[in-house]
């Protein structure tokens, strides 16, 4: 199994598929790079598709330190440097979008040529005057308590809410298996950190072309959250998926892959 070892000796699992301009897929909280498996066979014909499991997730080391969005972004920086990747497209789903934004805030876009944001608002928390956050304080406490005391029903409900239509039992089983690879101590730590993250004030700093992909079934986010991003990110394109909730790349993979290819072809053609 391919791993890269970070400076703090944490091993991150990754896979590469295809060659060409690199697309680094960054998964959401509790998840893994395996959630992007429906992209690799199509996109790898023209691009180098990379799945990376963030620290504490999937097949990566379950270290008990470093579980913040800012550290995950630094891990991405170290990964890109070690792999000698340039002109990278960062594709972040859910919490992965926070990692993309934090990366650009910390390091700029010297080796990044585009960003793909998949179903994520600028903050998950319901700050005063902010209507696009799925968590209030009571909801966050409930989620963290469930992870520590009775995680299985919470995770099963979480998976169901990620889809507009209930996924097949076999689909639910492999997704649940991926989530359960993560110890509860890590799950609750990163859930708290990512829920408190707030990128509303830095969206205007994103100075690479950005594709915004949102499901129209608003179990997690409404398309209005995507419209807010489009209004605040200088060079952003919003595409919505009518049969999707939180996972258009799994729920409507053909439409998602086609949309991503069209966006990338336009960006690469202009670079």
UniProtKB/Swiss-Prot annotation:
Residues forming coiled coils: none
Q: Which domain of life is it from?
A: Bacteria
Recorded hits in InterPro entries, A to Z, give: AB_hydrolase_1, AB_hydrolase_fold, AB_hydrolase_sf
UniProt GO molecular function: hydrolase activity
Q: Does the keyword Hydrolase apply?
A: yes
- What Enzyme Commission number(s) appear in the record? 3.-.-.-
Give a Gene Ontology cellular component term annotated to this protein. membrane
A Pfam match: Abhydrolase_6
Name of the protein in its database record: AB hydrolase superfamily protein YdjP
What is this protein's gene name? ydjP
């Amino acid at each position: 199994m391919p791993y890269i070892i970070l400076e703090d000796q944490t091993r991150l699992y990754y896979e590469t598929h295809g060659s060409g301009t690199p697309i680094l897929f960054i998964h959401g909280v509790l998840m893994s790079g395996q959630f992007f498996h429906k992209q690799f066979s199509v996109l790898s014909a023209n691009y180098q598709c990379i799945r990376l499991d963030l620290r504490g997730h999937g097949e990566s080391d379950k270290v008990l330190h470093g579980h913040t969005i800012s550290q995950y972004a630094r891990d991405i920086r170290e990964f890109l440097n070690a792999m000698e990747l340039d002109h990278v497209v960062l594709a972040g789903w859910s919490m992965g979008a926070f990692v993309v934004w934090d990366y650009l805030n910390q390091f700029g876009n010297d080796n990044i040529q585009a960003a793909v944001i998949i179903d994520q608002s600028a903050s998950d928390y319901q700050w005063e005057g902010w209507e696009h956050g799925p968590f209030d304080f009571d909801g966050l406490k409930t989620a963290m308590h469930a992870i520590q005391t009775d995680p299985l029903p919470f995770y099963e409900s979480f998976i169901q809410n990620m889809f507009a239509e209930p996924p097949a039992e076999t689909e639910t089983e492999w997704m649940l298996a991926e989530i359960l690879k993560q110890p509860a101590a890590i799950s609750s730590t990163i859930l708290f950190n990512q829920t408190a993250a707030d990128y509303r004030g830095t969206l205007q700093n994103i100075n690479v072309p950005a594709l915004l992909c949102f499901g129209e079934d608003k179990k997690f986010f409404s398309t209005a959250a995507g419209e807010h991003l489009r209004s605040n990110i200088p060079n952003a394109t919003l595409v919505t998926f009518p049969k999707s909730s939180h996972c258009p790349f799994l729920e409507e993979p053909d439409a998602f892959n086609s949309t991503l290819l069209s966006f990338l072809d336009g960006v690469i053609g202009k670079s």
